[in-house]
């Protein structure tokens, strides 16, 4: 089986996907209302799409192609407003967050769609435990070789993206000690982790054909890599972010990734080397476990810094690129948010410390998603 052609795509355009929680407004547990919500959304003409996800207590929204941060924010707000209106008609709530803090995974139902049913047969209980919620960001690439170079360049910022977006400290009613517990569920899948270190599309085709011949995978969808090429869109897809609590944060994360991509493309700050991946798993664990307080090991120098400090330093490096991309608002939002509260995991823990009730935490998450909370 061949990968086929890598589609033409305008460089540095964006696409944003968000997986959302559907909760009831009685006790704020997950609600199996995806079918009804999708039916109501058919009456709304919005950019992008809203589609089912693995279980019937979640949905995925996607923007259309976005030129910049403001475009992404505008599209996300328009889709958000339509979804909130439809949810109100069903007396359910919608919220961000990488995990629902107290849902019982065994009560989940797989959405009635052939691919989801097939995955359920293959992965068993892991499929129901995959009721987790992430943000994916697509970045347009002018060609396949450039896409792979960008993929490997962005890989050193995977811990930064995890720490900034982390919003999943609670699982099954328990504080896990992780800022992003969601990714622990992803790591359970056999094709998760990082992409192989190949830098040309021809070499990637060779790898892909070897994998399909083994019967381990059938298509690119079977790879759950942190970043993967998306040839049919002409993009790379960054997949490690927890779903933020607001569309503003989601758009800002997309803007940050766009700025990093331009910085890597224009300044070429380092040469790619497979040894750069030596601290990759350690850095990723530090980001998941400790968030912004995690330690980042620079793959070139071996220097140890906190992710908080390295992220703030990256904002300074990206200043001119943010101006060129009209993404200053994204960087300013993330800097202010980092200095004020940290990340969404910190906010969730703070509200739980105040309220001592996870249902109230979810209620306030719904308010924030609707643009009404603190």
Curated annotation (Swiss-Prot):
One matching Pfam family: GCS2
Catalytic reactions of this protein: L-cysteine + L-glutamate + ATP = gamma-L-glutamyl-L-cysteine + ADP + phosphate + H(+)
InterPro entries: GCL_type2/YbdK_subfam (IPR050141), GCS2 (IPR006336), Gln_synth/guanido_kin_cat_dom (IPR014746), YbdK (IPR011793)
GO molecular function term, any single one: ATP binding
Origin: domain of life: Bacteria
Record-stated family: Belongs to the glutamate--cysteine ligase type 2 family. YbdK subfamily.
Role noted for this protein: ATP-dependent carboxylate-amine ligase which exhibits weak glutamate--cysteine ligase activity.
Name of the protein in its database record: Putative glutamate--cysteine ligase 2
Organism per entry: Leptothrix cholodnii (strain ATCC 51168 / LMG 8142 / SP-6)
Upper lineage: Bacteria, Pseudomonadati, Pseudomonadota, Betaproteobacteria, Burkholderiales
